[in-house]
From Swiss-Prot:
Its EC number is 2.7.7.77. NCBIfam families: PRK00560.1. The N-terminal domain determines nucleotide recognition and specific binding, while the C-terminal domain determines the specific binding to the target protein. Gene3D superfamilies: Spore Coat Polysaccharide Biosynthesis Protein SpsA, Chain A. This is Molybdenum cofactor guanylyltransferase. GO terms for molecular function: GTP binding; metal ion binding; molybdenum cofactor guanylyltransferase activity; nucleotidyltransferase activity. Transfers a GMP moiety from GTP to Mo-molybdopterin (Mo-MPT) cofactor (Moco or molybdenum cofactor) to form Mo-molybdopterin guanine dinucleotide (Mo-MGD) cofactor.
Length: 201
């Protein structure tokens, strides 16, 4: 069955991170460019996959990639915080709600994303797995803009502080696996195995 497309909420793929813990052959590697399944990069995999669910997918990053897609460029070159991408997205897209997801969480199911996008009476609706809060796999409302501006002004880049100071709600999901974050090469290799298993299952 084809997924009904979410056409009233844009999806912003957060890809402006540092990849500081992602090391291949003793070299820090940009994980966005690691191949995944039949795709040339994690970036292409996530972008293509999310377009099956959202009418509009935009990539938030520090510089545009070869992948032909709409980009939101973060101006802060030496500072790495997803708050810049979230703030920039609201200023640029001028839309009440935006769904955010990091590039390095390729296993999140469409069911989970739809559940998060279905709860609209909070400033931030975020995913929570058995062991962790996932503040970046979340639906945000534009009424968080003042809090975002204040956090950036005071240089408090802790997402948890900002989310807890807004009217936020955690949606509990029981599968830890789908929220695997590809911080390291080991995480990436695990995700490759999981996707292989899913394809064969």
């Amino acid at each position: 069955m084809k997924n009904p497309i979410i056409d009233n909420i844009p999806c912003v793929l957060l890809a402006g991170g540092k990849s500081s813990r992602f090391i291949t052959n003793n070299i820090q590697t940009n994980k966005a460019l690691m191949p995944l399944k039949s795709y040339s990069s994690l970036l292409e995999y996530q972008y293509t996959r999310l377009l099956k669910l959202f009418k509009k997918v935009i990539i938030s990053t520090k510089k545009s990639y070869e992948l032909n897609a709409p980009y939101l460029l973060e101006k802060e070159s030496d500072l790495f915080s997803p708050l810049f991408g979230i703030h920039n997205a609201f200023l640029t897209l001028q839309t009440p709600y935006i769904f955010f997801i990091p590039i390095d969480t390729p296993l999140v199911s469409f069911e989970s994303i739809k559940a998060l996008c279905g709860i609209k009476n909070f400033s931030v609706t975020y995913a929570k797995s058995p062991t962790k809060e996932h503040y970046l796999i979340s639906l945000w409302h534009q009424n968080t803009l003042n809090a975002l501006i204040y956090a950036l002004k005071t240089q408090n880049y802790r997402l948890s502080d900002l989310v807890k100071n807004t009217s936020s709600v955690a949606i509990n999901f029981d599968k830890e696996e789908e929220f695997l974050n590809l911080n390291t090469l080991k995480d990436y290799e695990l995700a490759v195995q999981i996707l292989k298993k899913r394809a064969n299952g």
